[in-house]
């Protein structure tokens, strides 16, 4: 399929920035605005790409979430959720806090994904991204890991039920996408593939390779847990070697992918040692798989990524650039973007597209880590021989 035939959507509205737990919370949607403006200054993101989100309906939310949970989020939006209910629904800790109008702002993220899905399925668009989404930890009846409504899981269910699609989810966030996995654990119409930092040391503690699905869904969950301090070469080797046979075996109609960028060595919440090289390459790999197996149909979500100044805007820009068929840029970042945002930044902004390897430490256990990771890959590959 030539680039001229492809049309790409980019979900954005300033209202998406209102999904905010507190001013000090690490989940900061300002990263979405930074990425959007970087792409615009680059001259690649145009107004015709923009897909406006909407507020998802309760029926749409209930494709995954329990009715009582949705009502609890509504109550929390107005500050009338009891202490016992807050504990029951996962809203009593410091990770996933209650905030005003949280139902509306969370449902808007879901609605953006569904608008994009409809336009792809109608043929108006070939592909698209929703970098403000990717809330893959939320469980059917419980908030979890900064996530209220699981827009990834809802989109998968929506594509399955409304359009009868076989959906492959590729999740490369450093944290295992537990909410998405458990939502489809007994289903054989969705395959959930996740490559992530091992749950031995990182939230949510799940994603072991033995978690393969259950009942008719057995074999439709694929987990690749990686060792802490995994670097570019090992990550990409394992990813490339395992994802192709998974896709070829499952034969999806559409791909949904989660592009958390928290495997970067500067991310404050994880223990991985990848650079921008890995984060730049991943969306191009996923795009190539979509072109080969799904006539180009793919929805790319954001996800984790908590160094919002030095990592996320540059990394997420490549999600959109991959979708429109542009090669990764080189050289300096747009001067206007740097000039606008440096006064607000909590650090000195990077001035070019490449990592300067600031504070990067060569990992002494590189060989050992790579061997452990490849053993995990071999176990998974044996299932698809």
From Swiss-Prot:
Look up the signal peptide feature and give its range: none
Keyword terms of this UniProt record: Acetoin catabolism
Q: Name one GO molecular function term.
A: histone deacetylase activity
Entry keyword Ribonucleoprotein: no
Pathway per its UniProt entry is: Ketone degradation; acetoin degradation
The Swiss-Prot or TrEMBL record describes its family as follows: Belongs to the histone deacetylase family.
Q: What is this protein called?
A: Acetoin utilization protein AcuC
């Amino acid at each position: 399929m030539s680039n001229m035939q492809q049309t790409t959507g980019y979900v954005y509205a300033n209202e998406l920035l209102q999904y905010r737990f507190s001013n000090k919370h690490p989940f900061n949607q300002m990263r979405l605005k930074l990425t959007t403006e970087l792409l615009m200054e680059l001259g690649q993101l145009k107004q015709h790409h923009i897909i406006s989100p909407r507020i998802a309906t309760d029926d749409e939310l209930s494709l995954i979430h329990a009715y009582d949970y949705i009502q609890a989020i509504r109550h929390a939006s107005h500050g009338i959720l009891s202490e016992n209910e807050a504990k029951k629904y996962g809203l009593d800790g410091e990770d996933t806090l209650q905030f005003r109008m949280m139902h509306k702002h969370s449902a808007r993220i879901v609605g953006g994904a569904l608008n994009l899905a409809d336009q792809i399925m109608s043929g108006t668009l070939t592909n698209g991204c929703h970098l403000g989404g990717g809330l893959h930890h939320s469980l059917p009846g419980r908030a979890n890991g900064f996530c209220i409504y699981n827009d990834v899981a809802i989109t998968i269910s929506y594509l399955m039920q409304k359009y009868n699609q076989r959906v492959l989810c590729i999740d490369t966030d450093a944290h295992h996408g537990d909410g998405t996995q458990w939502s489809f654990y007994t289903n054989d119409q969705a395959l959930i593939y996740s490559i992530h930092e091992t749950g031995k040391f990182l939230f949510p503690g799940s994603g072991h390779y033995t978690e393969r699905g259950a009942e008719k869904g057995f074999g439709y969950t694929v987990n690749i847990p990686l060792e802490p301090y995994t670097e570019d070469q090992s990550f990409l080797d394992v990813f490339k070697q395992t994802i192709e046979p998974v896709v070829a075996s499952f034969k999806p109609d559409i791909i949904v992918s989660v592009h958390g960028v928290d495997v970067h060595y500067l991310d404050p919440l994880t223990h991985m040692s990848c650079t921008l090289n890995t984060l730049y390459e991943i969306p191009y790999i996923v795009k190539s798989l979509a072109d080969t197996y799904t006539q180009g149909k793919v929805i790319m979500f954001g996800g984790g990524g908590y160094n919002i100044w030095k990592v996320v805007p540059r990394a997420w820009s490549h999600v959109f650039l991959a979708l429109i068929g542009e090669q990764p840029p080189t050289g300096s970042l747009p001067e206007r973007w740097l000039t606008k945002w440096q006064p607000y930044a909590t650090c000195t902004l990077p001035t070019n597209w490449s990592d300067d390897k600031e504070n990067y430490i060569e990992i002494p256990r590189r060989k050992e880590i790579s061997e452990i990771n490849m053993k995990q890959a071999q176990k998974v590959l044996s299932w698809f021989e």
